[in-house]
Swiss-Prot record:
<comment type="function">
    <text>Part of the ABC transporter complex PotABCD involved in spermidine/putrescine import. Responsible for energy coupling to the transport system.</text>
</comment>
<feature type="domain" description="ABC transporter">
    <location>
        <begin position="10"/>
        <end position="240"/>
    </location>
</feature>
<dbReference type="InterPro" id="IPR008995">
    <property type="entry name" value="Mo/tungstate-bd_C_term_dom"/>
</dbReference>
<dbReference type="InterPro" id="IPR005893">
    <property type="entry name" value="PotA-like"/>
</dbReference>
<dbReference type="InterPro" id="IPR013611">
    <property type="entry name" value="Transp-assoc_OB_typ2"/>
</dbReference>
<keyword id="KW-0813">Transport</keyword>
<dbReference type="Pfam" id="PF00005">
    <property type="entry name" value="ABC_tran"/>
</dbReference>
<dbReference type="GO" id="GO:0015594">
    <property type="term" value="F:ABC-type putrescine transporter activity"/>
</dbReference>
<dbReference type="InterPro" id="IPR003439">
    <property type="entry name" value="ABC_transporter-like_ATP-bd"/>
</dbReference>
<dbReference type="GO" id="GO:0005524">
    <property type="term" value="F:ATP binding"/>
</dbReference>
<keyword id="KW-0472">Membrane</keyword>
<dbReference type="InterPro" id="IPR003593">
    <property type="entry name" value="AAA+_ATPase"/>
</dbReference>
<keyword id="KW-0067">ATP-binding</keyword>
<keyword id="KW-1003">Cell membrane</keyword>
<dbReference type="InterPro" id="IPR050093">
    <property type="entry name" value="ABC_SmlMolc_Importer"/>
</dbReference>
<keyword id="KW-0547">Nucleotide-binding</keyword>
<keyword id="KW-0997">Cell inner membrane</keyword>
């Protein structure tokens, strides 16, 4: 039985971690309740493993505080923390058999031999390895070795079990089987699991609570259902499952416009004529032969059988929708689409344009992003004045040849918005530049960045 309590067993308060001039974690605060199965989810490089290693004690926070069971342990070494860690690479001792691998920690604690025997057998039973205690670990499959690693961790009866992508090296079927076993194990043990993964489906399957991370920050914390159905921003919507994410305008409460059409929705409190992001899951779109019911009409561009459903792309007046349905429509078929009000999810836009801090050089030049840009003539401000600089997303120009740009950067995040791509480009000045483009770029592409003079708005900073 999972004995969940309101009391937090892990408290991470305003924790940051720096490696030189790079920020791995940026002011992270997280509370984990006793008995919870919490998954820290995010792409490679988001900071999830760094956070786990800080909780485990393998690294030390640059700023902030970590408590376990109310005790401050930020500087406490790993062996003195009430946690055990299971890694992707099982880290078993090849010269020891299964029994001795599991018993190793107990022997270090000078636990009585009879007690060790009972605990090892109980741990082996928990992971379904009762008949394997005297086998060499090299003779075991990957899944069996991972079970031994988990048994070695739980035999010490930690208050918290930390799992760093423990199933990543397993094949798909074995991974699915182990997911179910981990979930049952968590229920039986009743201890707190903190699990790190980049696999969205794994997180949705296993977790009581999901913590979504990106660029060293927590983006959203919630139940799997909340995270999936009510993503807080476009990153979460795109990263968790598949989504149609579109630019829209909230006309007023419960009425939104996107794709040139007005739709009823259930969202309120966004104000009138407010730019928003609209999220519709592919399975929430109804597709059928064109009829009066259709809110949008379009043509099927692709259709792929996925085993349980068909996945189709439908082009509606220049906007591309991803649709999942049990019914098959041939490529080229004219179809209607319909979405119900409660299946339209509205998100406040994180930003409506690029905003930078700058300094006016003279009437036609402004410095920002570490470079001097030509701009339209600025009246009424003296040279050297600190200013705010705004640039619309679609006015930023990216070049294949880095040397052609005023500055350079790397494409870090790509979001398809139905009729264009919204890119996050990490500039070499260590600031994000956001770009709307019809050109196809890949994550990791090095690019030149150019901003035309007439695209730069220089605004006086007011107190």
């Amino acid at each position: 039985m999972n004995m969940q309590e309101d009391k937090s067993i892990i408290e991470v308060s305003h924790v940051s971690k720096f490696f030189g001039d790079k920020t791995a974690l940026d002011d992270v605060t997280l509370n984990v309740k006793k008995g919870e199965f919490v998954t820290i989810l995010g792409p490679s490089g988001c900071g999830k493993t760094t956070l786990l290693r800080l909780i485990a004690g393998f690294q030390t926070a640059s700023e902030g505080e970590i408590r376990i069971s109310g005790k401050e342990i930020t500087q406490t070494p790993p062996h003195k923390r009430p946690v055990n860690t299971v890694f992707q690479k099982y880290a078993l001792f090849p010269h020891l058999n299964v029994y001795d691998n599991i018993a190793f920690g107990l022997k270090l604690k000078k636990t009585p031999k009879q007690t060790i025997g009972k605990k090892v057998k109980a741990a082996l039973k928990m992971v379904g390895m009762t008949d394997y205690e005297y086998r060499d670990v090299d003779s075991l499959s990957g899944g069996q070795q991972q079970r031994v690693a988990i048994a070695r961790a739980i035999v010490n009866e930690p208050e918290v079990l930390l799992l760093d992508e423990p199933l990543a090296a397993l094949d798909l079927k074995m991974r699915k089987d182990m997911q179910m076993e981990l979930k049952e194990m968590h229920k039986s043990l009743g201890i707190t699991f903190v699990y790190v993964t980049h696999d969205q489906e794994e997180a949705l399957t296993l977790s009581d609570t999901i913590v979504v991370m990106s660029e060293g920050k927590i983006q959203q914390i919630g139940t799997p259902i909340d995270i999936y159905n009510e993503p807080i921003n476009s990153f979460v919507a795109d990263f968790i499952g598949e989504s149609n994410i579109l630019n829209g305008t909230m006309i007023h409460d419960k009425l939104v416009r996107f794709c040139g059409t007005e739709f009823e929705c259930v969202d309120e409190g966004f104000g009138e004529n407010t730019p928003v992001d609209v999220v519709i899951r592919p399975e929430d779109l109804y597709i059928f032969p064109v009829s009066e019911m259709a809110q949008l009409t379009g043509v099927v561009q692709t259709s792929i059988f996925k085993g349980v459903h068909y996945e189709m792309t439908v082009l509606c007046g220049g906007y591309e929708f991803l649709v999942q349905d049990y019914h098959h429509f041939e490529v080229g078929a004219e179809v209607g689409l319909l979405v119900k009000p409660f299946d339209i999810h509205i998100m406040k836009k994180e930003r409506v344009c690029n905003t930078f801090e700058g300094k006016l050089q003279d009437a036609t030049h402004v410095e920002f992003l570490g470079c001097t840009f030509e701009c339209a003539s600025v009246e009424g401000l003296e040279s050297g004045t600190d200013v705010k600089v705004e640039v619309d997303f679609d006015k930023v120009i990216l070049q294949d040849n880095e040397e052609d740009g005023t500055l350079t950067g790397e494409v870090k995040f790509i979001l398809y918005k139905g009729d264009h791509y919204h890119l996050t480009v990490w500039s070499d000045w260590d600031e994000n530049v956001f770009v709307d483009t019809n050109d196809v770029w890949d994550d990791g592409d090095r690019v030149g960045i150019t901003i035309p003079p007439d695209a730069i708005r220089v605004i006086k900073i007011t107190d």
